[in-house]
Swiss-Prot record:
Keyword Acetylation carried by entry: no
Residues at the active site: 247, 336, 338
Reaction(s) catalysed (UniProt annotation): hydrogencarbonate + L-glutamine + 2 ATP + H2O = carbamoyl phosphate + L-glutamate + 2 ADP + phosphate + 2 H(+)
E.C. number: 6.3.5.5
GO MF term list: ATP binding; carbamoyl-phosphate synthase (glutamine-hydrolyzing) activity; glutaminase activity
Name this polypeptide is given: Carbamoyl phosphate synthase small chain
Amino acid sequence: MYGILVLEDGTIIRGDGFGAETEVLGELVFNTSMTGYVEILTDPSYKGQIVTMTYPLEGNYGVEKEWFESDGIKAEGFVVKDMTGLKLDEFLKEYNIPGISGVDTRYITRKIRSKGVIRSLLKTSTNPITKDEETELIKKVVEYPDISEIDLVPEVSTKETVVYSADDEKTKCVLIDCGVKQSIVNCLVERGCSVIKVPYNSKKEEILSYTPDFVLVSNGPGDPENMAETVDTVKNLIGTLPVTGICLGHQIITIALGGKTYKLKFGHRGGNQPVKDIESGKVYITSQNHGFATDDCVVPTGSELMHMNLNDDTVEGIRKIESEDLKNTVWSVQYHPEAGPGPHDARFLFDEMVELGIKFKAEKAN
């Protein structure tokens, strides 16, 4: 099958198509992980994006449902140097997702690093793609909106409340689902925290009706500036019970506290991002997947920076300056402590969330 990747600047990259025979548009990004293609493809945060893998060989260890981070592939397309094994090809076909292999992924990655993330089109076809078709495809890419103009969260958030019960429940949280990864839910449930997953646009009254011990705002795709409903809910929740966040949830909390976010040139996507804990000086290798960040020049009033990225000094965590009253506790991280894929250096943060919930539960009982 023929494959073609068309970039907004008119660049045409031809290769071998695999997966579904179709055509998709999206923001072209790169991921530096050496493993974890199943988790990456099924991560809801990749909605609206075509993912290029910098590691050259993909598909060599198959596909298993237990590795899924959602109910199916959420990335729009997949770009690899070499694809091996039928399972990856069949996996993409099952979810009607195109892939292209046999292309210079180093060239693509350098281009993204130099120019920034790029609007692109990926087309696969059993018939050769003509020069006349190329012209039409370039036109489609140029007319495609920037990802910040697309409201992606409604496409990946749960439509109804879902409960994940811990066998030995120690605490309970409401998870505001902006496109949560299953690994996040698993990390909480394994630690004795029951999780009530609610839609991104749930209101304060509904959330409090579940009597949670804390709230977690999840990861997800797109620009946090599009999340006005969720931001308002988080504003109203702060001061009522502890609030935490991961990735997009971190950005939403930043805005809710009065801070600002901005779009990164090419984002952080991979399993090898070094993050420094400012207070302790410890460094953790983290898994990341984001294209927006907290503006360190507009730190929310009454808050402080918690973690920083050692590669580019961007903000990786903030917290509201601590109060003796647990209901005022607010903290969030930009990276993914659950990994999936990636190192587990930061999974202790789920222990801290659960401990926070247990303490607040006890405080409420007194």
